[in-house]
């Protein structure tokens, strides 16, 4: 269970890195912010890619499980950064995504 919590926390940090790496260019392109924001955006996306390599599972399984956490972090971003309160549909969808992540992450592992 401790490993599951560690992986979930790592997914959370990974999602924040990805969202920041995409949000900063969005600010440049849609809000007219300084192009210098592209520098930390690129660094954040590089950190995101590196963080994905820290997971012990196969890449495809890691990406699949990560997706569930990403959805929840994006909803938290919606609420805390964009100032939009998630709807009950958002929350139910996020819970379903987390359940999917847990099913993938907690599946029995074959003995090597």
UniProtKB/Swiss-Prot annotation:
Signal peptide: none annotated. One of its GO terms (cellular component) is plasma membrane. Pfam families: UPF0060. It is a multi-pass membrane protein. Its main location: membrane. The chain crosses the membrane at residues 9-29, 34-54, 65-85, 91-111. Keywords: Cell inner membrane, Cell membrane, Membrane, Transmembrane, Transmembrane helix. It is found in: Cell inner membrane. Belongs to the UPF0060 family. This is UPF0060 membrane protein Mpe_A1656.
């Amino acid at each position: 269970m401790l490993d599951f919590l560690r992986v979930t926390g790592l997914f959370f940090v990974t999602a924040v890195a990805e969202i920041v790496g995409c949000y900063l260019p969005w600010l440049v392109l849609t809000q007219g912010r300084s192009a210098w924001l592209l520098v930390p955006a690129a660094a954040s996306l590089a950190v995101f890619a590196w963080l994905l390599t820290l997971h012990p599972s196969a890449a495809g399984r890691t990406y699949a499980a990560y997706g569930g956490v990403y959805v929840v972090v994006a909803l938290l971003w919606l609420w805390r950064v964009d100032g939009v309160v998630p709807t009950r549909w958002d929350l139910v969808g996020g819970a379903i995504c987390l359940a999917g992540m847990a099913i993938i992450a907690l599946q029995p592992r074959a003995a090597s």
